[in-house]
From Swiss-Prot:
Keywords associated with the record: DNA-binding, Nucleus, Transcription, Transcription regulation
Gene for this chain: SCM1
Protein name as catalogued: Agamous-like MADS-box protein AGL8 homolog
Extent of Basic and acidic residues compositional bias: 171-180
Keyword Ligase listed: no
Amino acid sequence: MGRGRVQLKRIENKINRQVTFSKRRSGLLKKAHEISVLCDAEVGLIVFSTKGKLFEYATDSCMERLLERYERYSFAEKQLVPTDHTSPGSWTLENAKLKARLEVLQRNEKLYVGEDLESLNMKELQNLEHQLASALKHIRSRKNQLMHESISVLQKQDRALQEQNNQLSKKVKEREKEVEQQNQWDQQNHEINSSTFVLPQQLDSPHLGEASQNTNVVDNGEVEGGNSSQXQGAANNTVMPQWMVRHLNG
């Protein structure tokens, strides 16, 4: 004898209702996983308990991608079948969709930081781990790319600064060479301008020299070492230079 059909209505007993929800929820999530694996279908399942707790299942644990695909599909359907967006029913439905998506995003945000992991089974934890590992791989790849780009920019700046330094060093050396040459020219000009021509002294006649050596004049006019006649004779015997003779004759 088979079981009778269970009448579908709200279970009044709170405990029985909670037990039935737990069993049916587990069976529903299991069926969603089975149809996803067996039929290679993308399945998204969202369940809220009476206390507002969220339970979900998504193929490859990517509920956001499924919701975006669903929204694109719904938007395309709405374009084909015009609806009255001003009606209260359409706004209520849109509000419910946005609220559901917001709750999914908030829950995933908690999962990504390691919160509320108690409700996940082994398969869901593995999928979450795979998502985090993939995200970490992309983050590291992007970080390495930015680091290589920064290093490349710094290397270009270093080469530019080195080139500027070489040019400045070359200009400094050229300037020092010019200053050294200018100092040498200034020193040479100073030596030329400060030098004087010394005229040779005219030698006295040998006879005049002998006369000056043999004759010593004193204050009283007397000639020392001989008489006046001898001094006069010595003076008469003095030979005059040619330039003086020409001067006297002229």
